[in-house]
Amino acid sequence: MTIDDRGQIRSARRIVVKVGSSSISGENAGQIGPLVDALAEAHGRGSQVVLVSSGAIATGIPYLALTERPKDLATQQAAAAVGQNVLIYRYQDSLDRYGIVAGQVLLTARDVENPTHRSNAKRAMERLLDLRILPIVNENDTVATHEIRFGDNDRLAALVAKLVEADLLVLLSDVDALYTKPPQESGAERIAHVGWNDQLEGVEIGSAGPSGVGTGGALTKVSAARQAAEHGTAVVLTATSLVVDALRGEPVGTWFAPAQETAVESAPAS
């Protein structure tokens, strides 16, 4: 189905949710529980849910006795190898409360670009969803190199949404929406709705926080949202703390209308 407004979110067949490193690692690791609560609620309504989760490298950093994100590729790969294991354990531990089983899917850019690999990935994802498994997707940082990386999981999330033909993509961040200028500045206004042909210039989404563990920003999120919308997937960009409201169709964050949408959302900005 094509979702033309937030009121249809509760009946979405397939939903992809993307969460960034800074939202679920370090001092924010406790947000995994509430995030899973929201995913489980949507799953319980009958929606097929896919989670695209960053955080392998960031989660692995303290286990390697490092104090900051490593700059060299080999140490990044080592941190990812350790962190991905811990991250999946944390998700499954939380999902156990709902009797939901997670399935780990690790992809590289080549897996999506190569037709044979893409077909295999799609088949596996389709089967997982048919079995009511909740796929948790991440870039395969342990084998990815600088030349074949997605660069950020916002782009990966858009590609996954296309791969599984999702009705909705929810891009989670540290702030609640796109703004006309940095949200901490006076006069900043939330952008509640972005139509397919709307031009976005000078928008802000705020910083990723002081941790420096993520790789995405406003431009990557807008680009990913546009990419998903181009293929008929509605997009909500909002804060991780608002994921429950977003998946209930509440007027939070910024709504990106899918390409074939004709109706304009009437919810006022706040």
Swiss-Prot record:
This is Glutamate 5-kinase. It is an enzyme of class 2 (transferase). The keyword Kinase applies. Belongs to the glutamate 5-kinase family. One of its GO terms (biological process) is L-proline biosynthetic process. ATP binds at K18, S173, D174. InterPro entries: AceGlu_kinase-like_sf, Asp/Glu/Uridylate_kinase, G5K_ProB, Glu/AcGlu_kinase, Glu_5kinase, Glu_5kinase/COase_Synthase. Keywords: Amino-acid biosynthesis, ATP-binding, Cytoplasm, Kinase, Nucleotide-binding, Proline biosynthesis, Transferase. It is found in: Cytoplasm. Its main location: cytoplasm. The gene is proB. Pfam families: AA_kinase. GO terms for molecular function: ATP binding; glutamate 5-kinase activity. Pathway: Amino-acid biosynthesis; L-proline biosynthesis; L-glutamate 5-semialdehyde from L-glutamate: step 1/2. Substrate binds at S54, D141, N153. It comes from the Bacteria. GO terms for cellular component: cytosol. Its EC number is 2.7.2.11. NCBIfam families: proB (TIGR01027). Catalyzes the transfer of a phosphate group to glutamate to form L-glutamate 5-phosphate. It catalyses: L-glutamate + ATP = L-glutamyl 5-phosphate + ADP.
